Amino acid sequence: FNSNSLKKYSVIIGIGGNIGNTKKIFDKLILCLKKDSRFTLLITSPLLKNPPFGFLEQSDFLNGIIRLKTNLCPNSFLKAMQRYENKFGRKRSFQDAPRTLDIDIIFFENKKINTKNLIIPHKNWANRESVIIPLKRMNNNGKKSKLKCM
């Protein structure tokens, strides 16, 4: 019996970070997501190194994309992702600040949500190379893609 069939929502998240050993943090996040019964990981993108935007006086970011399945509703999924950000040391000091781990919900099934706490699809996804390029590479690499540094 395929556990994917039990999870009804397909979700694409963007991950990014520029504090500490970002690659190691991403690897640990992926292990946590794989162990978490609320999620089934489907595919990950290659990583992309990007310059910061907004606040420019900081290190470049590593970014990637993860596609997974879940039964959580969008708000519960958001809370779960925020808990993972906190687990890996995310501090919210100011907008576009350096961070250990940033998790953005890019798409949640084909839902459109616009609330104070949650906007899906992510409002800036189409303007961000940090989303577009890994998404294209993930889609071109087939099902066996692994999150890896370029």
What do these predicted regions represent?
Residues F1, P51-F61, L72-M150:
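Flexible, gly/pro- and Lys/Arg-enriched active-site loops
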